[in-house]
Amino acid sequence: VAIAVLTVAVLVTGFILWPKSPTNLAEENAQARAQLLQQWKAGEIAVLVRHAERCDRSDNPCLGPADGITRIGSEAAAGVGQGFARLGLQQTDILTSPVTRTVQTAHYMFNSDPQTQEWLATCGTTMRNDVVAHKVAHRNLVLVTHSGCIADFEEQTGLKHAAKDAEYTSALFVRIDGSGQLQVLGIVNAEDWNDLLK
């Protein structure tokens, strides 16, 4: 009996301490949301945004090339862009992967064509350090990238068991302080921006 109780205790403790997927920031209490907004105003935030719906994996009408996004995806990207605009983009650097679907997503999200960066397409074992290296003090950083890159980042920040396929146009928010210390804050899915900013 003692062994069974000990086994259950170990399993429960392991489950509680098991790093899981980031929390949905739109479901946080008002104080947590206010803290996120304060950190955004201070320029302490980096956000990894997954591109919009892929044309080559959907039956929805495409905007153009098959490696781009769908019309529905462009509308979702524009909606997420409105959320970022409500946060304020005056002190925000925006970078995108050079792949067509991320470039199109960034264009519809921000009504501009942000600078492309190859590391946002290749990702891999240096993703966490690359994000920190590109984050300028007192300026937010928005990175339009891919689900595999977001998964690499989550694994390198201790979320080894996070869901591996981020939703289209979902945004992973991270706080990076002046000394490069990183804290994953959570995600905002495309449909949750109004709840986040209420």
Give names to the regions the model predicted:
Residues 45-46, 137-145:
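Generic beta-sheet signal
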Residues 2-118, 123-126, 134, 150-151, ...:
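Active-site-proximal alpha-helix that buttresses catalytic centers in soluble enzyme cores
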Residues 131-137:
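Short helices/loops that flank or line small-molecule/ion binding pockets
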